[in-house]
């Protein structure tokens, strides 16, 4: 039975880590270089995140400076940022890209909150799918007489309690992210 708990915790913690990584790429009131993690360009015949081909600095609260290691990709980076969903207007001076980051409008904040809720729901679904897979494995063991019916009920109950706990964690992470988006 302990094997199920360890397996469940490992899978559920991966879901929480994935949620955290996705939330790092959302723009909030505070600017972070993580928002550029998902922006990619074609570089040496493969899609490459701009974070891997340039340095990204934030010298001021509302200014981002992107300095590619290869100047020939400046235009590609600029175009990728323009085509992204970040609503930013980069300025290319021939050696670096500067982005003056405007304050988020209330409409844009609402869009980001909506997207954050969608991401949280996707991760809740992943959590429920993990629960369903584990429930099916345990039920199969009971059918094959590897565990008793009482043990099955106890394990299923533990799985449900753990699932509920992880879904509450996802809700808590979502609430703090919404608060972060709405302030500043």
From Swiss-Prot:
Keywords: Cytoplasm, Protein biosynthesis. One of its GO terms (cellular component) is cytosol. It is found in: Cytoplasm. PANTHER family: MITOCHONDRIAL RIBOSOME RECYCLING FACTOR PSEUDO 1 (PTHR20982:SF3), RIBOSOME RECYCLING FACTOR (PTHR20982). Belongs to the RRF family. InterPro entries: Ribosome_recyc_fac, Ribosome_recyc_fac_dom, RRF_sf. GO terms for biological process: translational termination. This is Ribosome-recycling factor. Pfam families: RRF. It comes from Borreliella burgdorferi (strain ATCC 35210 / DSM 4680 / CIP 102532 / B31) (Borrelia burgdorferi). The lineage of its organism: Bacteria, Pseudomonadati, Spirochaetota, Spirochaetia, Spirochaetales. It comes from the Bacteria. GO terms for molecular function: ribosomal large subunit binding. Responsible for the release of ribosomes from messenger RNA at the termination of protein biosynthesis. May increase the efficiency of translation by recycling ribosomes from one round of translation to another.
């Amino acid at each position: 039975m302990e094997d199920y708990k360890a397996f469940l915790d490992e899978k559920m913690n991966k879901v929480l880590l994935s949620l955290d990584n996705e939330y790092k790429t959302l723009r909030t009131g505070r600017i972070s270089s993580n928002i550029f993690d998902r922006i990619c360009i074609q570089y040496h015949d493969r899609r490459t995140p701009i974070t891997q081909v340039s340095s990204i600095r934030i010298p001021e609260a509302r200014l981002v400076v992107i300095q590619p290691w290869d100047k020939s990709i400046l235009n590609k980076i600029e175009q990728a940022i323009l085509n992204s969903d970040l609503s930013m207007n980069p300025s290319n001076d021939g050696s670096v890209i500067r982005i003056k980051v405007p304050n988020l409008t209330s409409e844009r904040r609402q869009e980001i909150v909506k997207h954050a809720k969608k991401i949280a729901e996707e991760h809740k679904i992943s959590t429920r799918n993990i629960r369903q897979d584990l429930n099916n494995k345990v039920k199969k063991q009971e059918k094959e007489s590897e565990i008793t019916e009482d043990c099955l009920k106890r394990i299923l109950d533990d799985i449900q309690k753990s699932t509920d706990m992880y879904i509450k964690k996802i809700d808590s992470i979502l609430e703090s992210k919404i608060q972060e988006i709405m302030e500043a």
